């Protein structure tokens, strides 16, 4: 099995660099023929995946956090071989970053790189849905989630706290709660228009965000639908209670939360705000998002 591994040595606060020799040795021990390319800058994984000769490989592997997987996915969709719908290799994951939400779908932790390589060696692809969103006249793809509103404030605040690991998202949430505000949002879901005074919207393909937040407990990766979580205007005190319930998914029981499954969603905010797709700050509202049903293969356990 011939694989291309796009490796982010800066993942996990730079800890991934020290892991590379061990990961390389284990890949070889599993009998995999690997080409390993390390990324050198933000956006490099996009370029590598976009320019790779995909038909030379049996799988394309992202090794890093959710941001690395996001870049590899988007480079994959930019690749002319992928666009031709011929000889499309599956994607795989070796997690070793700070934010590793998608690995939870594979029942992996950030230290489970050996188990991840075992999964890759099994060569058992599964068809998955992919989210596609258009913002600022550009189109991107995601496997995890796109957030807007208060969640982008949290993401920005968590960046200088990445040294704290998964705790960075929790600390950032508590810090930004001081500045909590809602705003008017126009939301079109499968053609039906809603007007809301919202705090945030999350559009999820998978169940987790920020590794530990069980944001979309009913999400399925192959149902042809995205799970939309809308938090309407809420007090700081009640938001604190909602926040603590996100870890086990019971936040969806609060009346301020709307949980909707749909194929398409469009969002316009009264004051255009930034987007946070798969942990990356990229684009802004207005945004159009849709589900591409079973559009890629992903190496699964």
Place the predicted regions along the sequence by residue.
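Glycine-rich phosphate/pyrophosphate-binding beta-alpha loops
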Residues: 147, 151, 202-216, 281
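Gly/Ser/Thr-rich active-site loops/lids in small-molecule metabolic enzymes
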Residues: 162-168, 212, 217-238
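Short glycine/serine/threonine-rich phosphate/pyrophosphate-binding segments
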Residues: 45, 67-72, 102, 128
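ATP/nucleoside-binding phosphotransfer catalytic cores, i.e., glycine-rich phosphate-binding loops
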Residues: 189, 195, 220, 230-301
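ATP/NTP phosphate-donor binding region
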Residues: 1-63, 74, 192
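A generic structural signal for short beta-strands and their flanking turns/coil linkers
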Residues: 181-183, 197-199, 222-227, 261-263
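Catalytic core of DAGKc-family lipid kinases
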Residues: 30, 78-199
